[in-house]
Amino acid sequence: MNDADASIQIQQMVRFIRQEAEEKANEISISSEEEFNIEKLQLVEAEKKKIRQEYEKKEKQVDVRKKIDYSMQLNASRIKVLQAQDDIVNAMKEEAAKQLLKVSQHGFFNHHHHQYKHLLKDLIVQCLLRLKEPAVLLRCREEDLDIVESMLDDASEEYCKKAKVHAPEIIVDKDIFLPPAPSDDDPHALSCAGGVVLASRDGKIVCENTLDARLEVAFRNKLPEIRKSLFGKVGAA
């Protein structure tokens, strides 16, 4: 082989090697581009999924917030309704207390005065029947003292007939009286609309039969009926 043939053969080998290198480089480039596109697509899909999850999370948070807000508004409305109902019921109770106070007011022209005397006697008898003690201590308002003392014999006699026992010893406490009637001058002071409180001599058994206590008991017992009558259904106490 002469130099010319050798040169041609070398050039052919160089072209072959260069062509093969270019093909390999092209394959690598195509493969890299495909891998890049796949990786890019995966990143895009991952970001899309992340955005969707974030949106769903925010949407759920909004729904929960809406439900909480609605529940709070509903509860606030219910509280307002219940408060309004309580205000009406309490206003009725206050009016009943005012009317009850008229029963125990003294005065010649007070047509309730005679009724109050008999009411005091009934309250005393009721306490005696509950206590069933041979000796009791009685407390009343200072302004009711004369009426109470005038009724003791009748009350004791009626108790004896009903309980079939001997007359008890009734000691009227003239040192400590029940609070006076409510006054506009001091509306927050302790007050009593009338009635009596009887206790055993040792003070262990007490029967509170004031008009205030009776009103409280009657009102508490009748409260479901009052609410049903006013609001059409039994409300919360």
Swiss-Prot record:
Signal peptide: none
Domain of life: Eukaryota
Primary location group: membrane
GO molecular function, one term: proton-transporting ATPase activity, rotational mechanism
Coiled coil: 9-67
Family: Belongs to the V-ATPase E subunit family.
Protein name: V-type proton ATPase subunit E3
Organism, scientific name: Arabidopsis thaliana (Mouse-ear cress)
